[in-house]
UniProtKB/Swiss-Prot annotation:
Origin species: Methanospirillum hungatei JF-1 (strain ATCC 27890 / DSM 864 / NBRC 100397 / JF-1)
SUPFAM superfamilies documented for this protein: Ribosomal protein L22
Record keyword rRNA-binding present: yes
PROSITE patterns: RIBOSOMAL_L22
CDD domains cross-referenced by the UniProt entry: Ribosomal_L22
Name of encoding gene: rpl22
Any GO BP: cytoplasmic translation
Quaternary context: Part of the 50S ribosomal subunit.
Function: This protein binds specifically to 23S rRNA. It makes multiple contacts with different domains of the 23S rRNA in the assembled 50S subunit and ribosome. The globular domain of the protein is located near the polypeptide exit tunnel on the outside of the subunit, while an extended beta-hairpin is found that lines the wall of the exit tunnel in the center of the 70S ribosome.
Protein name: Large ribosomal subunit protein uL22
Length: 154
């Protein structure tokens, strides 16, 4: 069996980590969300992603932005989307990291995201039913996400 390790070796007693393996979400959406929440406070990132799930706040698409329309409310960028499914996975991960931090004795309101990465996972083979009893093969993409937070001094 393969062993997983974090790509960024952040060490110290003031960090907490979390990881999601093989999440069935779009890799492009996961990469854009990772680039957006990197460097944010944990509570601010969670509040913003809840707004994305409610279709109130868009995520700016800076890399995968071909044929992506403009969104009202984006500052410093014009193209954006509302990746709800990926945002729900990130919210679960942020909640997991917050609980890991509390278990390690860190304060939840002073946590800042220092590392987040989204990498393509394995492809799961599936089949899409077609007419006349045929089936078309289709690959389902997965994503591996890792997140590290550090307690910041007030």
């Amino acid at each position: 069996m393969a062993r997983f390790d974090y790509s960024n070796q952040v060490t110290g007693k003031d960090i907490a980590r979390g990881r999601v393996n093989e999440a069935p979400i779009s890799p492009k959406h996961a990469i854009e969300i990772a680039g957006f929440i990197r460097g944010m406070k944990l509570d601010d990132a969670a509040a913003y992603l809840e707004g994305v799930v409610a279709l109130q706040k868009p995520i700016p698409f800076k890399r995968f932005n071909r044929n992506v329309p403009h969104r009202k409310g984006l500052v410093g960028w014009d193209a954006g989307r509302y990746p709800q499914k990926a945002s729900r996975v990130y919210l679960r991960l942020l909640n997991n990291v917050r609980k890991n931090a509390e278990y390690n004795g860190l304060e939840g309101d002073q946590l800042r995201i220092v590392h987040v990465s989204a990498n393509r996972g394995i492809r799961r083979r599936s089949f899409m039913p077609r007419a006349m009893g045929r089936a078309t093969p289709k690959d389902r993409q997965t994503v591996n996400i890792e997140l590290v937070v550090r307690e910041q001094e007030a």
